[in-house]
Amino acid sequence: MGRLVFNYRKAMREPKKIQQLTENYSLPFAVELIPAINYFIFVGLCFGFWYGVRMIFPHAFDNSYVIVIFGIPFFLTMLVTKIKPEGKNIYIYFFDFAKYYFFIKLPQKKYCNDRKIDLSNEKQIEFRKLVKVVDYSNETKNAYEGNTQEFAVNKNGRRVGVLPNKKQFDSYAK
């Protein structure tokens, strides 16, 4: 008997649907939840816009309530359902875009290899002068000897190999 591999991706990505409204009443067909929520949000927005226009111009759009309540929200719901920028839901896309804009673009943060660069906004970056490092105590003399690593600080807390009485080492010297 061979091994059966099941792919549940299609079943898990099935949108949530509403059919049973109350215990005694159910719809004859299922309605997807997200487009239904979008529709009622767009009905509220269109009705508010229509009401504002009617307050300013009382005789404008006398018999257009059918278009405002059913037509425009239905069109906007279908449009929002079809548009998938970068393969994402449009609301998730706008949320991610707002997060990027307010947390990265406006503060002018810069990243390199997913790490924040702290000194990218500095006008002038100063480097410390180089010093000549000398430590011949555990020098490897033969190829068969091991190269044991030492700490950069000795027991007294001083840096090993830096000669403070010597002058600065110039890396650009010829």
Swiss-Prot record:
GO terms for cellular component: plasma membrane. It is a multi-pass membrane protein. It comes from Bacillus subtilis (strain 168). InterPro entries: TcpE. Keywords: Cell membrane, Membrane, Transmembrane, Transmembrane helix. It is found in: Cell membrane. It comes from the Bacteria. The chain crosses the membrane at residues 29-51, 66-83. The keyword Membrane applies. Its main location: membrane. Pfam families: TcpE (PF12648). This is Uncharacterized protein YddD.
